[in-house]
């Protein structure tokens, strides 16, 4: 039996919702699983991945087998990975969710969605990417004492997204190391008040709130110095008509949000604008990904 899992890319934090908010977008990693006589892991698109038991898809699948007291059989795993790695688009969460869903289906769907989310969060360490990867939409999550509390809302389909992906990686560890150990009380209030507006802005048609809802003082000011050209990308995206611009996850991708009615004009302007920025401030090139929100989440066939 061959099992195929598709998992969407995710964009965490959404500006103000540091380590709490995330949303899924229409870019998908796919993984197929088949039982075999030996472990065989390959990449269908040439992406360099570990081909042994250190592979995150395999480790996640094994984690589920271990949790239910079963021995994982030898597997043939084939990955297709269009989600760029170490760019703030949830590539590791996609691997974790793929491994868990593949293993869960092999075992007859022994874990429910909440149990899968909890196990995924224990592997990843935080729920802001794994929740939207599994559930789709915009998720608000808390991880407390090993329990995940998560709420999913469908994102307004009149919005479109532009993931502006630079040609350099930013590892999450480095991005987290840049954060201060303490923050000012007023900065916490600044973010809390804006994060409270995010669901209305993204899910209830309040596009007038998109810009203010995604403003941040907790992480972006500290991470953007590690992202050459990001300040200019923010400015360019706004000039081209973006309603909101924020650092996706830990970076290095910048996510811009626009109204779908203006999508073609927005994307065309942005593409030309990014060409003007290439070679500036240590970034040689940008890839522009035209995306929508994914309200379905991961799927298994």
Which residue ranges define each predicted feature?
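ATP-binding N-lobe of GHMP and related small-molecule kinases
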Residues: 1-87, 101, 109-111, 293-296, ...
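FAD-binding core of FAD-dependent oxidoreductases
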Residues: 11-13, 17-24, 86-96, 124-139
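Solvent-exposed alpha-helices and their adjacent loops that cap or buttress functional pockets
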Residues: 13, 22-25, 69-71, 123-124, ...
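DPxDG-like acidic metal-binding loop motif
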Residues: 27, 89-113, 134-136, 144
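Short beta-strand-to-loop capping motifs
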Residues: 35, 166, 256-260
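Alpha/beta catalytic cores of group-transfer enzymes, especially the acyltransferase/condensing modules
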Residues: 113-159, 245
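Active-site rim beta-loop-alpha module in soluble metabolic enzymes
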Residues: 163-225
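Glycine-rich, charge-dense phosphate/pyrophosphate-binding loop(s)
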Residues: 202-301
């Amino acid at each position: 039996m061959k099992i195929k899992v598709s998992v969407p890319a995710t964009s965490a934090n959404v500006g103000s919702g540091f380590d709490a908010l995330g949303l899924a977008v229409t870019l998908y990693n796919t993984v197929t699983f088949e039982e075999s006589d030996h472990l065989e892991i390959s990449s269908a698109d040439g992406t360099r991945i570990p081909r042994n038991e250190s592979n995150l898809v395999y480790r996640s699948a094994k984690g589920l087998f271990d949790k239910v007291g079963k021995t994982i059989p030898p597997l043939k795993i084939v990955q297709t990975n269009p989600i760029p790695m170490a760019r703030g688009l949830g590539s590791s969460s996609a691997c974790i969710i793929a491994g868990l869903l593949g293993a869960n289906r092999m075992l007859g769907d022994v874990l429910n969605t909440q149990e899968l989310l909890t196990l995924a969060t224990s592997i990843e360490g935080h729920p802001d990417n794994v929740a939207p990867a599994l559930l789709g939409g915009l998720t608000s999550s808390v991880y407390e004492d090993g329990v995940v509390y998560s709420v999913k809302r469908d994102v307004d389909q009149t919005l479109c997204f532009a993931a502006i992906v630079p040609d350099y990686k930013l590892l999450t560890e480095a991005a987290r190391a840049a954060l201060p150990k303490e923050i000012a009380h007023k900065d916490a209030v600044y973010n809390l008040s804006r994060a409270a507006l995010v669901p209305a802005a993204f899910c209830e048609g309040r596009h007038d709130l998109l810009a203010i809802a995604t403003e941040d003082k907790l992480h972006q000011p500290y991470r953007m110095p590690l992202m050459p050209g990001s300040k200019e990308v923010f400015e360019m995206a706004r000039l081209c008509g973006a309603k909101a611009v924020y650092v996706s996850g830990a970076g290095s991708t910048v996510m811009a949000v626009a109204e779908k009615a203006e999508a073609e004009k927005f994307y065309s302007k942005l593409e030309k604008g990014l060409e003007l920025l290439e070679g500036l401030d240590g970034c040689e090139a940008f890839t522009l990904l035209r995306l929508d929100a994914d309200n379905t989440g991961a799927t298994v066939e």
